[in-house]
């Protein structure tokens, strides 16, 4: 099968991070300068998740206002349409973009407006997964998820937990997701990406219906647990 044939196949993208999916052209336009590929991607010598996550800092500078978030949503669906993606679930962390000029509701709405315009122009269906971040406080994360619930079924489909897993184990977030269940918000959790496999078990016990970026699911008893609980297999 050729590259062109692969491009023509219809695709579904279930694990896409907004700030990791912006085109180089979009980043350069927003920053008003040339950007090298090295600024946007890790080298083969990358040794940790923390080092990897630093590459999200530059794209994040493009998402500081409503125009940037609108444009980012539009840009992502534009580039996905070129790969014949027909449906995408796009993750982003609203609290990264909150400022004196934009509250959480405005942040989410700005992205959804851009995605909706992209859907109309390029025919790509979408949903948004709002990410709580491990280094944010429980209060901050809960308030973000509560606000995102206003958009549930109107562009937002779920919440997530992402960030430096080794520094913030899953045990610190059990109460957050107990409260998230009470809000009626479905959720997926990044777990087992680094740190120990117990984070996967804890994420499932917390109520996650999906586990993302989970290398440790190759362990036999973890696989059995995933099968018994009917968890959607991890997106690597």
Residues of each region from the PLM?
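Active-site glycine-centered loops adjacent to acidic/histidine catalytic or metal-binding residues
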Residues: 190
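Metal-cofactor-binding active-site regions of metalloenzymes
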Residues: 1-185, 194-199, 205, 209-210, ...
